[in-house]
Amino acid sequence: MEILGERMLLRPLNLSDSERLVSLINASVNELREFMPWMRENVTRKEEDEYLLRAVQEMNLNQAFHFAMVLKESKEVIGVIATHPIDWLNESVSIGYWIATAFSGKGYTTESVVLLLEGLFMELKLHRVAVSTTTDNVASNRIIEKIGFRFEGVQKLAGKVAPSRWKDLNTFALLDTEYKSMRKNLFEKFLGGKYPKVKLA
């Protein structure tokens, strides 16, 4: 599945993304490691290849989706947005994302989340999408809130960010009915009024 928006393209990750992702991660590690325990100095090509192999396998088995966040005009990969394993029985999933520091604050992540929601709700017909973020991750909380996710509560010390170090998590969710009621407004607000184009594999 590929999803095209106003400025962003979400496309499945593949092994050829490894070198670019290693470069982005290592350039952004100081800003992002507070919120992501796996993100540390000197992420290696081998480690990234292993992640990408797992991601491709999960996508092939329809277990989860891992997308490169790509600038539509320049074709640059600037981050990753993905689902955790999908609960097909209950038609629900949680999502996560990161963007390289050099590209943050420009609305790219917000657009990418909206594009992913379109794919999950309108194409995969899921019922519920959730996201958790540390309570001190101001940028991520702001993105989720302005899109319209519903705040469900705080999970006490549920996010491990370093060995023997945990943080509280804010938990948000959105139902299919809620998304459909705000869908047009989201496109006007974050996609210049254009509807996303979803291409199924």
PLM features: what roles do these ranges have?
Residues 33-53:
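Conserved GNAT-fold acetyl-CoA-binding loop/helix
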Residues 53-68:
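A short helix-loop-beta-strand connector motif used in the catalytic cores of GNAT acetyltransferases and
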